[in-house]
Amino acid sequence: MTVTDLRERLAGLTEAEADLLETKLRAKLWAKRWNAWTPYPWQVPPDEVETHGMWLQLGGRGTGKTDGCARYMVAHVNGPPCDDRVPGGHRMSIIAPTQGDAVESAVNGPSGLKAHDPRVALRTTAGGTHVRWPSGAEAKLFGAHTPDDVERLRSGGNRCLVWLEEA
C-alpha cells in the first residue's frame, strides 16, 4: 500500500469510523509506551551482584523513578503474600520529605499508585495516613521533615517493602 492509497482510504472513512480508528490507535500507542516497557541494561542489577534486597533508581526529572516504584509496589501487592498474619499479606511504607509529598507524588501523582491501580484508597486516621488495597494490604505514609517525623519512622514496625520517594 502506498501513501497515496492510505490517504484515499482514510479520506473515505465516515466520522464514526475515523473516531474508532483514532481510539484503537491511541490504545495501541499507550500499550506500546507503558506495557512494553523494558529497562535499559544498566537499570537491572547483574546476577552476580548481591543487592541485599535494595535497589537505587537514580535519574533526573521525568526519568520514571516514581513510575517504576509505583509499578513495583502494585506488582508486589498482587504477588504472593510476605506475611500471612497481616491482612492482605503486605505491610509497606512510603517515606518522602513530607507526608504531603508522599500523598501528592507517590499516591495521587500522574505516575503514582492510583495511576497504576485505581483500587487504591487513601485513608487518614488517628494512626496516620495509609494507602489500602481491597485485599487488605497497606502502605503507611511517612514524612521525614522534622525530628518528630523521623521519630515516627522508628515506631513504624516491620515492613516488607519501603519506598523512599524524593520530592
Residue ranges and their predicted role:
Residues 2-167:
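Phosphate/NTP-binding elements of NTP-utilizing enzymes
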